[in-house]
Amino acid sequence: MATVALLRSLRRRELHAAHISAYKFSSASAGGRTTELRLHGVKDIIAVASGKGGVGKSSTAVNLAVALANKCELKIGLLDADVYGPSVPIMMNINQKPQVNQDMKMIPVENYGVKCMSMGLLVEKDAPLVWRGPMVMSALAKMTKGVDWGDLDILVVDMPPGTGDAQISISQNLKLSGAVIVSTPQDVALADANRGISMFDKVRVPILGLVENMSCFVCPHCNEPSFIFGKEGARRTAAKKGLKLIGEIPLEMSIREGSDEGVPVVVSSPGSIVSKAYQDLAQNVVKGLKELRENPDNEIQMKLNVPHSSHSS
């Protein structure tokens, strides 16, 4: 079976980790990027990242990808690079093993107009991935170069949370066009978001902007906002860093329900306020990538404008 052969290959590669030069991290290369994993037919690759777990990075990546495909009418792929905690199969309602084409490349599983690949599709459900770094890097190589992505406008990469070796290696070896940093408004999450910003700066990946997830909770009875995790923390952080806030996503039960049921909220409730927030985020990402192409020297600061949320005052 192709997926079994893949996992055996990964184990062999772990034993020969010294030969995985494409993913070998060197502090001397921190100032530049390699092109080892440039993907044929993929115009742009963007990372959706967070400095810590639990801030809604994966739900943001999923709804952003679906909004890019359906609202912006683009050809989109979604790579679940969160190897230790893959959640894309559940959120996108995909559970079938990927097929292998005549070139021995895996064919991504498609749903909601998005081509998806995840380690969660290749291992048994609930099976723990007790892997060391080289094996993780080898797996990610298989899920990029070993996949027939076809022609894509954007490949959205759901990054592992944090700023460790895996995140740095992915950022260096995938030809990232830009990164989106997801955070909640509270100080502890923003401190970790700052570390993520610094990491992408060091590996010279342009930052498209920050997304403030769980920005507020709007009472369904009185329509009054409650700023449970703080107010406008990501906006202030973006301003201090000279970046832009490109999305504000409210705390809403429909996001959680959609994630658990495998129906992204932009599909289940396309006219809702929260879906509009994801659609605005998608449009801002497209604008940011367009600006980078037109102004390649302007790698960090995106001239985007996100109006204050109607619940911010």
Swiss-Prot record:
Residue numbers binding ATP: G51, K52, G53, G54, V55, G56, K57, S58
Principal localisation: mitochondrion
GO biological process terms held by the UniProt record: iron-sulfur cluster assembly; mitochondrial respiratory chain complex I assembly; mitochondrial translation
Presence of the UniProt keyword Mitochondrion in the record: yes
Keywords: 4Fe-4S, ATP-binding, Iron, Iron-sulfur, Metal-binding, Mitochondrion, Nucleotide-binding, Transit peptide
Co-factor remark: Binds 1 [4Fe-4S] cluster.
Observed effect of gene inactivation: Homozygous mutants are lethal, seeds failing to germinate or arrested seedlings in early growth. Loss of mitochondrial complex I and low levels of a 650-kDa assembly intermediate associated with a reduced mitochondrial translation activity. Heterozygous plants display delayed bolting and flowering, with small and highly branched inflorescences; they also have sporophytic defects in female and male gametophyte development.
Segment annotated as transit peptide: 1-22
Domain of life: Eukaryota
GO molecular function: 4 iron, 4 sulfur cluster binding; ATP binding; ATP-dependent FeS chaperone activity; metal ion binding
Gene Ontology CC, one term: mitochondrion
Coiled coil region boundaries: none
Cofactors demanded by this protein: [4Fe-4S] cluster
Location relative to the cell: Mitochondrion matrix
Protein role: Essential during early vegetative growth. Required for the assembly of the mitochondrial membrane respiratory chain NADH dehydrogenase (Complex I). Involved in mitochondrial translation activity. May deliver of one or more Fe-S clusters to complex I subunits.
UniProt similarity note: Belongs to the Mrp/NBP35 ATP-binding proteins family.
Protein name as annotated: Iron-sulfur protein required for NADH dehydrogenase, mitochondrial
Native organism: Arabidopsis thaliana (Mouse-ear cress)
